[in-house]
Amino acid sequence: MAKLVIVESPAKAKTIGKYLGDDYEVTASMGHIRDLPASQLGIDVEHGYAPQYISIKGKEKLIKELKSKAKHADGVLLATDPDREGEAISWHLANILGLDPHEPNRVTFDEITKKGVKEGMAHPRAIDEDLFNAQQARRVLDRLVGYKLSPFLWRKVRRGLSAGRVQSVAVRLIDDREKEIESFKPDEYWNVDATLGAGHKSFTARLATDASGKKLLPKSEAEARAIEKGLEGAEYAVAELKKGKRAKQPTPAFITSTLQQEASRRLGFTATRTMRAAQTLYEGVDIAGHGTMGLITYMRTDSLRISDEAVAAAKEYIAGAYGEAYICPYKRTWKTKSATAAQDAHEAIRPSVPSLTPDEVDKSISGDTAKLYRMIWSRFMASQMADCQQDTVSVTVSAADYRFKASGYTVTFDGFTVLYEEATDEKEKKETALPPLEQGQVLKLRDLKSEQKFTQPPARYTEATLIKALEENGIGRPSTYAPIITTIIDRGYVERDQKKLKPTLLGRAVDGLMLEQFPHIVDVDFSAEMEKNLDKVESGKADWHKTVDDFYQGFAASLEQAEKNMEGKKVKVPDEPSSEVCDLCGRPMVIKVGKYGKFLACSGFPECRGTKRLVKDTGGICPKCGKGRMLERKSAKGRIYYGCERYPDCDFMTWDTPVPTKCEKCGSTLFRKGSKLYCAKEGCGFEMPVPKKE
């Protein structure tokens, strides 16, 4: 009789089943099997916040099958994911199947490889009650906030709204940033740059100080021109030359937050898309010559630890592929930068078999999984490589009563950069190589240019920078970053605008109400403290009932007071204006949000019920008919697509984005797909890479 092993997904079951053989039957629970009821609170507030769990609708047949298999099996092992959610699934499975949670029937796999599965099976343990209680406390807290607060929002703002404990903080961060941008007053300044010749080569130095070392930054054109006049006929010479060496270190292997940030910057992935691909890589894919195997370690982690075995395997590969000089000569260790300590003892995200290169894997997988594996593999390998060595030079140039400065570097040993360098969110100050210079050397002025500039407001959050802010402030956990962003967008509180996150008018109205009536709920420090309290529950240092009660007593009092404060009042969400006019009555139309996104409605509602689909002119011309403009539209499910304005006379449509660049072959509108631009006009076939930004 075989032992029964239960995991979450069929893909994971297939991979593990291959390693365990015929003595085990591996089956899937298809995620959670029990949860709080959707139609009621499901928490007994008067009796220790006891959750009233029920079987998830549609899982009855599966539960019956699991019970039957467990009854006839020679033992049951629960092998769900090694985190809070996985522990909760195992706890509920044990409860339903009548297993003793104190018996060693729980196994976990940090990597789903032959070695990883063997290691996990060799160390069964009891269900971690503290880990489960941390998940249970989070679930109860989120239900209390959502179930109690949502009806308040229905009455005071709009029906159908909902609120969340962590999501509300994310909306606040985004709204606060928007307020900063709106209140920002730009200051004018001028850069004065001198292009200087040194022999046959030249470089650019920027005005920095006067002769006494006082910083100079002209605030007007008049100031800049006065400096230019003061430089007329001046001799430019090297006043100070500093040379040095520096070593640039690689970034550590990914944790969940940095994986999502880098995939957003480098690959353009949303956090949800990243985690979906990572889940596939962890659970197992079929690799030619290797069979079905998990390609990466567990992807929900905030630990930067790497096993000695993985480090040794990486260094062995590096020596063979790049040479001994490229191996880091010492053991690298990193300390987590997050506001809280690492959640568990997982490793960082790394390839489960370091010697399995992306080129080899690409023969068997493609698309998102291939791109993400290449990024994970490259980052991990680079983390074990030698530093990039650079010679640095900074020069101060004297000219009359002014001093100009420039700096640069040359790479003397590329080290880890031969394989991987981290992408950046913002434009960094560029350093370039300087020509050979000597102290006192007279330079030739080739150009003197003043350029007007203005200080810039802080940038809106992207998914990458929001995740970074959440992590740094201790808000949420590795498993929650992606759902937080998905939720606030789905609820209509935030929208994407050119990959930036912008609060909607609805989001701003709700955030304003929350800040006014429930300041502690949207307070960053308060939310971070709650995460620390949940960590204490997980480590057995706090009781989950008391943790919930401490929060709920204050929350319930705030809710009661808010009801009194808002009695007879309602928050009006302003309509977003548009340039469209109603075809029925001629009144201006406004932008409203419905079930499937934004649409145009007559401002005279309810007297006039005129509506239109909201379309956006992209500026491109249809490649099929050559007459109609390409319009941005939304499908019934809210997905953006592009179609000809002459529909239905012309039925051209595409999911790919039109761009301003025209086809070099026929002059038609080009469309972007991934990293290439292509012409969609029949018979043309022109393609080109997406131009790199300067």
Predicted regions and their residues:
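C-terminal or mid-to-C-terminal helical accessory/interaction module adjacent to the motor/catalytic core
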Residues: I112-A194, K243-G244
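Short acidic, hydrophobic short linear motifs in intrinsically disordered regions
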Residues: V238-L241, P250-A263, H290-M299, P457-A469
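Short, hydrophobic-biased segments on the C-terminal half of alpha helices
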Residues: M275-Q279, I485-T486
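Intrinsically disordered, low-complexity regulatory segments
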Residues: M1-R139, K148, T209, P218-R225, ...
